[in-house]
């Protein structure tokens, strides 16, 4: 067994700690123990495919608010990283599935954060192989998304090229599920669901319209821009508020896309709440016939300003959802990370309004590190994961989950102020948490 995983007697000393800390109200807190970690350096780049347009051999031209064609001609103020740079950064991990034998499917998001600055960021997902003992990450395979058969229902950045690779100005992929030989990807611009084959070729793009309601964000390509003075209508999904999480049923038939931000009710002019909680919609989609169910569940946020990071089902209808605040760092900066949790939910456990019960949680700002495995050290035996966007969680085995950050390269500096975050991957022992009732 790997030394990083062989905690031995030390784990038994934490047995009492791993029992739930009951609270008078709400879900119980369970302990999480660091078992292993690996890192992919922030400055990891991939070459664009040979058949991609020449302009995609460099990325980051539009991140300063204007065009910068000179390589390394502008520096990101948060991290000092100079851009644009040759190649495509391997960053922005925004969805994960464990494939077994330390192999993981990881989705990269739209690139540099929004539609306007990411037209030279290529969309991709990767199969990564972890060497937990060495703390290193191998890139087994990279799949770039493309639309050679002209399936996408709107013009794309590379519209008139032969290969028609997709970019971060076309979609913002934030969640992924393997289904058979293909993959379904949840997007935030539409929000859309996108099916691609094993080579990344788009097979279909499905709009969101459960119950006959069209879900549209401000970035939806079919959103009409009103004339001056006119009221904007038809926008009910927040910008960067689409399918940040998307779970898959154990039988592989149903997807459960989860909005990152609350649905906007045009009639009331307010974000959706039930009782005293701001809620996020959990939808149902049948992959066999590509249709939406009318069923809607609701995930209750602990704070209206929070967001979710990922959602995966691991047993029956039981699943894991990351909920986080929008802050980073644990070094005393003005807006430090404070709320980074993973909640246990069950799709079969809702109230009369369809609001999910939060059964239990772990705190990613309070991870036990009895074996001192944290690569930059822990404080008083506690390891923290103080990233603004933590967007990856999945079950690895009966007692273990994998968690990873979206490092928003080169802008996030959660681990160390002024230094671009690496892609960090951790294994957590959460045996009691996974069994919580």
Residue ranges of model-derived segments:
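Bacterial N-terminal signal peptides that target proteins for export
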Residues: 1-6
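Sequence/structural signature of beta-propeller domains
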Residues: 21-437
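N-terminal signal peptide c-region/cleavage motif recognized by signal peptidases
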Residues: 10, 15-17
